[in-house]
């Protein structure tokens, strides 16, 4: 049995210790969502089937987003990639609408046409982006990024029945200090 409140607070306290020195920093956070996410391969027999690829997306205007991989002995290729728009990139609202439509349909209820539409959507999205950073799926590995970073699951095929992750979204952080990236940007601006 898990004490959800204690787990939630302990996890966040340890997470923020990676960014802030508590002996010199006052920190408050709010609007945090956290949940366990189980996903299954669209094609459990073919690891390389493009349908097993996640859709490139953003999570919203969150200063900190991330996940912890929780599938033991998972296929390392079932990790996550941070994506950057390439020269072909242009905002296409119809792709966002199609993502929403397909996401609302439970995986087991997708028709052959829905799967073909998903394949076309994956290909359309992929041609507008290039991979910037690749994280392999390793049990208990934590990755973080911002909600505005484009990213995708590289494969829902984990080599197991399901791909289990702990996903979190931090809506607000207030501190008398800066995150490491903020400090770096300020030093670059000041020329130090």
Model segments located where?
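Non-heme Fe(II)-dependent double-stranded beta-helix
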Residues: 1-44
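Catalytic core of non-heme Fe(II) oxygenases with the double-stranded beta-helix
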Residues: 44-150, 154-189
